[in-house]
Amino acid sequence: MSVPNKTTVLVIGGGPAGSYAAAVLARENVDTVLLEAEKFPRYHIGESMLASMRFFLRFIDLEEQFDAYGFQKKYGATFKINSKREAYTDFSASLGPGGYAWNVIRSEADDLIFRYAGEQGAHIFDGTKVDDIEFLSYDGADGANFTPAAFLVNPGRPVAATWSRKDGTRGRIKFDYLIDASGRAGIISTKYLKNRTVNEGLRNIANWSYWKGAKVYGEGSDQQGSPFFEALTDGSGWCWAIPLHNGTLSVGVVMRQDLFFGKKKAAGSPGSLEMYKLCLQSVPGISGLLEDAEIVSDVKMASDWSYSASAYAGPHFRVAGDAGCFIDPYFSSGVHLALVGGLSAATTIQAVRRGETSEFSAAKWHSSKVTEGYTRFLLVVMAVLRQLRKQNAAVITDDKEEGFDTAFGLIQPVIQGQADTGESEQQRMVAGVQFSLERFGQATPEAQRALLDKVQFAGQNAEELEKLTADELAVLHNIIGRQLKMTKVEKNLDNFTRDVIDGWAPRVERGKLGLQRADTSIMTAEMKDLFQLNRSLDSTKAGIQLPA
């Protein structure tokens, strides 16, 4: 089949965000075309999945097929931050006893989801690169509302795209809606909006390779076979060791870019393999796993800068996954955030097509949702990386605690992806984000504890938010505002469906996908404003930086 001349929704990019969005829309009987620049299967890094992935796959009936493929089971993850005892995040907390996610070979996992989107009815084409997007002015009744204040932009409405292939074939396709899931290339953000901002505190560089014959981490313990993340002893970065189902161990080092090149220069500018092995000398735990192993691939290197954008939506377009934002992969958040963005894009497009809400409201919901997810991980990652770089200073733990159990207990709903999927208590969610903020010194601990008490109490007494001082409001604007009413329910995408933004909540049901009015009768106007997710922290403006 050749690329059609017209479609309802054009998806750019066949990674997790794009393929998932295409599968969701196709199952809603929406004419969907997916164009992927690379020929699948293609190599990609980012091999460790979060517990939340099961729930996203379950919604599109892909969970059983994905599980049967044979990917390495992941029951949790282990983190060695300094000389204290390792921290372990157990997936049974969100998946039940014996529950697991997976470590995957991304070329195979991404291809599986990409092909599945085609099986569900999407028209999928790999080796087909989108070169340009055509826009028409958008002068709708709500056009003036697409402003930076609403975390939106109005470059016009995209109406067509031109594409090309390596064999010289070219074409043009018209569409009603566009989802940009083009990965780091981010055609909308980088070529047209030019609104991408790099987080200066997270300019890192990654070097990695694959090993055969490595020892198994935690052999004989309940953490046996766990992915292992270990801080470099000099505080310059961290290292991953992720076991894969083909018998290899993925081992990579993430370092601050300036420190990496400084170390390389001091060592006489060694080659990539020698430099990689030099860095591994700073992770005794992982080096021990590699004692009798052999390296079986070239050393790969990539910039690992974290970035975000000022908006992730506009008239008739949505941006999802790495096309919009990327956060340091310490907690393996990439695919999780991609799936959240893909589902949000599909949901908000359907809400408009079904006549449930305006294009402005739907676009704002999506941009707010993407901002919220990125910010939540940003806060937690930066708190932990601050501890990692400070090594034995008491940053996320106190001097008397032997490990990091308290810290990881608080941030668990974030780092397992529970905030968007299975059950999670409001107190734990707010406490986890609050815990991270305290570690940045955004306010005194006393002030933040007092504010936390008010925020937690607000679920029962909305009037409390009207009593916040100007200083407290400033701190609250740095907290991921959420109005969550959590009850014990079946583990699925219930937290995603309970996200109320501007009075709208998602309806995640096959055949009924869209947005619906939520009951906000108990919320005052000020409370609604404070808890809008688009008030999430902007990393650049807030000036959150890690210590040198």
Swiss-Prot record:
Pathway: Secondary metabolite biosynthesis. Its EC number is 1.14.19.-. FAD binds at residues 14, 17, 47, 335. Chloride binds at residues 333-334. GO terms for biological process: secondary metabolite biosynthetic process. It catalyses: sulochrin + 2 FADH2 + 2 chloride + 2 O2 = dihydrogeodin + 2 FAD + 4 H2O + H(+). Keywords: FAD, Flavoprotein, Monooxygenase, Oxidoreductase. It is an enzyme of class 1 (oxidoreductase). Disulfide bonds: none annotated. One of its GO terms (molecular function) is flavin-dependent halogenase activity. Pfam families: Trp_halogenase. InterPro entries: FAD/NAD-bd_sf (IPR036188), Flavin-dep_Halogenase_NPB (IPR050816), Flavin_halogenase (IPR006905). Sulochrin halogenase; part of the gene cluster that mediates the biosynthesis of geodin, an intermediate in the biosynthesis of other natural products. The pathway begins with the synthesis of atrochrysone thioester by the polyketide synthase (PKS) gedC. The atrochrysone carboxyl ACP thioesterase gedB then breaks the thioester bond and releases the atrochrysone carboxylic acid from gedC. The atrochrysone carboxylic acid is then converted to atrochrysone which is further transformed into emodinanthrone. Belongs to the flavin-dependent halogenase family. This is Sulochrin halogenase gedL.
